[in-house]
Regions:
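Helix-loop junctions at membrane interfaces in 12-TM secondary transporters
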Residues: 237-248, 304-306
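Short hydrophobic/small-residue motifs within alpha-helical transmembrane segments
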Residues: 199-201, 289
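Glycine-rich segments within core transmembrane alpha-helices of 12-TM secondary carriers
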Residues: 275-303
């Protein structure tokens, strides 16, 4: 059984001995553990959980340096230094006893996540995971996919989540603001129903646009769709009546549907087979985040007549 770890994990820009060159990677996590000597092998073994490490290389001072094989990082380096064994002799009832030998392990991890935009959120979770001292091979934290992502897959998924959040916002906008627009335009509930029905016709248009993606490239069509949807939605802020608003939202909703479809297709293409369900789940969460941000517009939409237009720009 491992001896209790010292409560001395540190996180900061750098924690290297004086005179030693500062490492360019950021951030840095430093852990100090006192463990049983019998458990030392686990610390000298490359990690195979959230990251797959290369076989260690011994530094001049005996420190083991582990590099990156695969993981959601642009940079990763883990250094493990083991101090001399300590053997403690005590007495129990006047009889000398010899305790299990322990060693001091200092682990320094330098990493740079390949997670744009959402990096701070995952950096916080990663630091907590690294400080836990867990060395069970293949044991993944609850917040990570069951299969290791490489830097490209992590970057692509992060950017798709950003686009998904925008798509969730744009796709929810008309249903959350139509009541306020109808009040300003003195439109009846029948007019509102007609507008919402016409907006849903845009789904048919989206199928035509998605078919173009196979010839023109999915990423180019995805970016064009998200930009086009945002621009057309902004035109809705100038609407003098329900017809203008309904027309702009019909095309905007069509492009938003294109965004949702292409995000799903690209995610399936880019993610490893063991992480596709994870990718779908986080994409759904970020789309819900965007929809929730749209609902937040209700806080000011009825402050004044026409205040709902702010949500469109």
């Amino acid at each position: 059984m491992a001896a209790p770890a010292r409560p001395s994990a540190e996180v900061g820009p750098d924690h290297r001995p004086p005179g030693q060159e500062a490492h360019p990677f950021v951030p840095v996590v430093v852990n100090h553990h006192r463990i049983d000597a019998t458990d030392l092998a686990a610390w000298r073994t490359p990690r195979s959980d959230l990251v797959r490490e290369a076989a260690p290389v011994a530094d001049v001072d005996g420190t083991l340096v582990f590099g990156l094989v695969e993981g959601p990082f642009h940079e990763w380096e883990r250094r493990v230094r083991v101090d001399a064994d300590e053997t403690t002799t005590g007495a129990a009832g006047g009889t000398a006893r010899r305790e299990e030998p322990t060693v001091d392990v200092t682990e320094t991890v330098h990493f740079r996540l390949a997670v744009p935009v959402w990096g701070p959120l995952f950096s916080f979770a990663l630091r907590r995971h690294l400080r836990s001292g867990s060395r069970t091979p293949g044991s993944m934290p609850w917040w990570s996919p069951p299969q290791v992502l490489d830097a490209r897959a992590a970057t692509v998924l992060s950017l798709l989540c950003v686009l998904g959040a925008f798509g969730g916002y744009l796709g929810t906008l008309i249903t959350q603001t139509i009541t306020y627009a109808a009040r300003q335009f003195d439109a009846s509930t029948t007019d509102q129903g007609t507008l919402l029905a016409s907006v849903r016709i845009g789904v048919l248009v989206s199928l035509l646009v998605v078919s173009v993606a196979d010839r023109r490239g999915r990423r180019a069509v995805l970016l064009a769709a998200i930009v086009g949807s945002a621009v057309i939605t902004a035109l809705g802020a100038l609407a003098p009546g329900m017809v203008w608003l309904g027309t702009t939202q019909t095309f905007s909703r069509a492009l938003t549907t294109v965004v949702a479809l292409l995000i799903g297709i690209i995610a399936i293409e880019e993610m490893p087979s063991g992480a596709r369900a994870f990718a779908v789940s986080v994409l759904a969460m970020t789309a819900a985040l965007g929809a929730g941000a749209c609902v937040a517009n209700l806080l000011y939409a009825d402050v004044a007549e026409g205040a709902w237009r702010v949500a469109y720009v």
